[in-house]
């Protein structure tokens, strides 16, 4: 099998397509959550903490000299990323928990008892007839 045919077979499998759709939706969801955190959650937290903007927090290791930019540890961006991750992970957890709850409810639905086969019905009739004969 040629390399191109193998790739077509791989790419056309359902799992790969499902994974690609999941990655695209996940990336879009990540942008939504990042915007939610940066634009909705962080401003009130910044006010509570005295007007601190986490993105601006950094430690200057070496000041800018001439054309060379300053060397900084931008720990504020790291804090922002950790908060984004925590909220995304929590949202995914809640979504999966809801899906699992729905699946459990579907599984717990009582199943109708199986109908007896013709052989079982005949055996039941024979049993009933034998019991009736013994009682006489």
UniProtKB/Swiss-Prot annotation:
Belongs to the MscL family. It comes from the Bacteria. It is a multi-pass membrane protein. Homopentamer. Pfam families: MscL (PF01741). One of its GO terms (molecular function) is mechanosensitive monoatomic ion channel activity. The chain crosses the membrane at residues 9-29, 79-99. It comes from Shewanella sp. (strain W3-18-1). InterPro entries: Mechanosensitive_channel_CS, MS_channel, MSC/AndL, MscL_channel. The gene is mscL. Keywords: Cell inner membrane, Cell membrane, Ion channel, Ion transport, Membrane, Transmembrane, Transmembrane helix, Transport. This is Large-conductance mechanosensitive channel. It is found in: Cell inner membrane. HAMAP family: MscL (MF_00115). Channel that opens in response to stretch forces in the membrane lipid bilayer. May participate in the regulation of osmotic pressure changes within the cell. GO terms for cellular component: plasma membrane. The lineage of its organism: Bacteria, Pseudomonadati, Pseudomonadota, Gammaproteobacteria, Alteromonadales. The keyword Transmembrane applies. NCBIfam families: mscL, PRK00567.1-4.
């Amino acid at each position: 099998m040629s390399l191109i045919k193998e790739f077509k077979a791989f790419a056309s499998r359902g799992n790969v397509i499902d994974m690609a759709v999941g990655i695209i939706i996940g990336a879009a969801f990540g942008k939504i959550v990042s915007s939610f955190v940066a634009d909705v959650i962080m401003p009130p937290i910044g006010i509570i903490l005295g007007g601190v903007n986490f993105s601006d927090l950094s430690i200057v290791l070496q000041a800018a000299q001439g054309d060379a930019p300053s060397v900084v540890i931008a720990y504020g961006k790291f804090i922002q990323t950790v908060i984004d991750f925590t909220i995304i992970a929590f949202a995914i957890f809640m979504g999966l928990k809801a899906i699992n709850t729905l699946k459990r409810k579907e599984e717990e639905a009582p199943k109708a008892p199986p109908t007896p086969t013709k052989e079982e019905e005949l055996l039941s009739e024979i049993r009933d007839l034998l019991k009736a004969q013994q009682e006489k």
